[in-house]
């Protein structure tokens, strides 16, 4: 059942789109661009050629049209009714770069894979960024959510973020202005991150390589890296590990439709082949219910759920009461 009308939305933008150099796709299948390989259509998907093209598009986009920004498609779950409005997917050509930006500093485009930042740092003897080798996704998302691994978080290495707002105005946010906390930033949600500046410290390349190898080996041993998964499903509650709570609640390997909580790492939700957005979200809410009933702790989603439900296939979020 089609829930969006991309051609109509595209036509409403008028002649201004003729000057846009990036790719505009009406009714774009989101299951082709998300790591879960599930979900409905984006009413309109836009992939800007570069930052100037992005700004030009934003200036012709009416304020009432919803705008959803995605990265490489990790850490998101798209609902089966699709995403109304415009989905902005930054292009690798314009936003996938990574380069040196001074002594022990690296500048990366928002769509640059996290592991490419780690590799650039290693090649140039810059320590402190090796942890990105074990984080799936892109740098823009890592900056937005304060991604971390192996005891290190983005906020420890980030200097500033370059961004544009909904009207196409440029902004620079310092580390302090990002307002970081665990897996969260207080940066305005309407800002579109375009690049991120990091600073590390001098370190022997062989040592960095060893650290990266340890990160990779650990990840491949304990995480379902070859499955259709969006990464960690839930945040770790204070003083607890989400995976342990899920395991103790008996949800390791739990299956709903085509979705499963991984038997290898039970805080990873996987698409076993034909899972729908409904299957995945229903499974997540069921796990939240089971953990609360057995452990008295309410898990919070780390995966972002985007879009609208198909009529008759809504998933009611578990409310519960946060334990004291």
From Swiss-Prot:
Its EC number is 1.3.1.98. It is found in: Cytoplasm. Its cofactor is FAD. The keyword NADP applies. It comes from Rhizobium etli (strain ATCC 51251 / DSM 11541 / JCM 21823 / NBRC 15573 / CFN 42). GO terms for molecular function: FAD binding; UDP-N-acetylmuramate dehydrogenase activity. PANTHER family: UDP-N-ACETYLENOLPYRUVOYLGLUCOSAMINE REDUCTASE. This is UDP-N-acetylenolpyruvoylglucosamine reductase. It catalyses: UDP-N-acetyl-alpha-D-muramate + NADP(+) = UDP-N-acetyl-3-O-(1-carboxyvinyl)-alpha-D-glucosamine + NADPH + H(+). Keywords: Cell cycle, Cell division, Cell shape, Cell wall biogenesis/degradation, Cytoplasm, FAD, Flavoprotein, NADP, Oxidoreductase, Peptidoglycan synthesis. Belongs to the MurB family. GO terms for biological process: cell division; cell wall organization; peptidoglycan biosynthetic process; regulation of cell shape. The keyword NADP applies. Cell wall formation. Residues 36-203 form the FAD-binding PCMH-type domain. Disulfide bonds: none annotated. It comes from the Bacteria. The active site is at 183, 232 (proton donor), 302. Its main location: cytoplasm. GO terms for cellular component: cytosol. Pathway: Cell wall biogenesis; peptidoglycan biosynthesis. Gene3D superfamilies: 3.30.465.10, UDP-N-acetylenolpyruvoylglucosamine reductase, C-terminal domain, Uridine Diphospho-n-acetylenolpyruvylglucosamine Reductase, domain 2.
